[in-house]
């Protein structure tokens, strides 16, 4: 029986949490915690250089649209190889950075914590790989009364394959939980 466990690969990080506005002394608004997941990009057909900012990701802004405050409580990126990866192996470079980082996807291996993973082929992994967001090195407040420039951003890169696949050989999903509070007053 094949082991189908997801492999976790924590990214080394520098302890530099983001700052945010302190809560007021008044009673806090009620809050809910919602899960989210979205496909960030695919690999294998062409060169892929992706920069995914969580504060402006469509799936998150839809959930956040009815609230004034949104905090990220959990987050990870999962690279999932497809069956096409066996015949068309690929290497993916990935790193979590803050939104205001000037690093480009092609420079991932020059960023502290940047890693390279190979999927497919005869001997390499075809299991999903999860890279948790190092919450201690970014500002997890995605929406507030002010804009923050140090929210999480995922950089991912895969070079153009020597024999491009017609279908993706891997995808990246970003998933986690959001704490939404202070509902916005809306017209019915």
From Swiss-Prot:
GO terms for molecular function: structural molecule activity. Its main location: virion. Keywords: Capsid protein, T=3 icosahedral capsid protein, Virion. It is found in: Virion. One of its GO terms (cellular component) is T=3 icosahedral viral capsid. The keyword Transmembrane helix does not apply. Coiled coil: none annotated. It comes from the Viruses. Belongs to the tymoviruses capsid protein family. Self-assembles to form a T=3 icosahedral capsid composed of 180 copies of the capsid protein. The capsid encapsulates the single-stranded RNA genome. This is Capsid protein. It comes from Eggplant mosaic virus.
